[in-house]
């Protein structure tokens, strides 16, 4: 079972703005259009889509935004509500989540506001090996509106640090012809926690 406080179950009359369901992701302003209730409902909807695609496990990661932990916890709770097991990879870049969703399982969700201002957050989703978009994202909204899910027990949760394997994959793919001196500026992004170590492992001098 999850090792954290679970938000309350989404009330039947909960209003979710359709405006947060974009072409390629779900994205809103915290807490006015995006909160823990919305995240848990999305977890249930995505979990049902995963089950229909014969996916029993979903990887979940998040960027460094302050709203990330609460939204991630609620999302995980929603996935587990409908019987989908979760691999929580914690703070990571979106490429690291995609890596986890291709090596540890085949589906994943990254809690991220991408390039948007700090009060935004959102979800990028991979289902059965491919990013979902367009009609598939709108179908999640319709499922939430209809409360179209079946609660199911038996899901498991465990944490996984994917950085070592991710770094080794990069080191296996990239070979520098000469040493380089580079400056890394992640613009307050979560890559600031991972990129310098990866570049140093490649043989770069990082300033």
Specify the residue positions occupied by each region the protein language model found.
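An N-terminal, well-structured beta->alpha segment
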Residues: 11-75, 81-82, 159-180
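Gly/Ser/Thr-enriched, mixed-charge loops and adjacent short helices
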Residues: 121-207
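Ferredoxin-reductase
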Residues: 54-128
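Aromatic (phenylalanine/tyrosine) cluster motif
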Residues: 4-5
